[in-house]
Design a protein with these regions (language model features):
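Loop-helix junctions at membrane interfaces
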Residues: 1-212
Length: 212
């Protein structure tokens, strides 16, 4: 039976990543504003937690990411233009918008890393996890946005009268590509370093590494 208990070192990493998420959320380190949506690098700590701590760690980090987003939507410590606008429409739905996609992202990433590691080494597994961290975050976030706010005047104006799928693609555009590239590279580098430091538990590794 696999143990779900985290070591002190792994909990330290979780705490560190949570701290980094708050730091990135309230400094220029975490967001690059391009168009109506910002490029976010906060998906990277979520991916790293999923690599080191599995679905549970990914979910916790995703929840922290969601919390920072919701606080920004409320105007606490910084403001998100889109988040603030959604909050004015519905604080409850905005909470769902902020938390659910990020938590689902973290959970999925933990399983993705485990699955990929059955066939590939740590570097490749971390790179794939980093890519999907940004990809799934965008997919889940935009899906939730369309489902809950798609009929609002705000989103209709952002779509510019275009088809929903085309409008979403145009909204994310360069932002999503930038997130995927940066998350892939950084998660691969950090995850490999943590693996060499023996901070990724056996439950996350399906077989011994064939390459570092």
């Amino acid at each position: 039976m696999k143990s779900n208990k985290f070591t002190t070192s792994q909990l330290t990493i979780l705490g560190l990543m949570a701290g980094i998420l708050f730091l990135m959320a309230y400094t220029p380190l975490g967001y690059l504003n391009i168009g109506p949506l910002a490029v976010t690098f906060n998906v990277i700590p979520v991916a790293i937690c999923a690599v080191v701590l599995g679905p549970t760690g990914g979910a916790v980090a995703g929840a922290v990411f969601g919390l920072t987003s919701y606080m920004q939507a409320m105007g606490i410590g910084g403001a998100s233009a889109l988040g603030s606008a959604l909050f004015q429409i519905s604080p409850v739905l905005t909470a769902v918008q902020c938390f659910v996609p990020r938590i689902l992202d973290g959970i999925c990433l933990g399983f993705i890393y485990r699955a990929v590691h059955k066939k590939a080494n740590t570097y490749v597994s971390c790179a794939v996890t980093g890519f999907f961290s940004a990809f799934l975050n965008t997919l889940f976030f935009m899906s939730a946005l369309v489902m809950m706010f798609g009929n609002t005047e705000l989103i209709q104006n952002l779509m510019g009268g275009r088809n929903v799928i085309i409008g979403c693609c145009m909204m994310v555009g360069v932002n999503a590509i930038s997130e995927m590239v940066s998350s892939t590279i950084i998660t691969a580098a950090v995850g490999t370093a943590l693996s060499k430091a023996h901070l990724i538990p056996a439950s996350q590794i399906a077989k011994p590494d064939t390459a570092a």
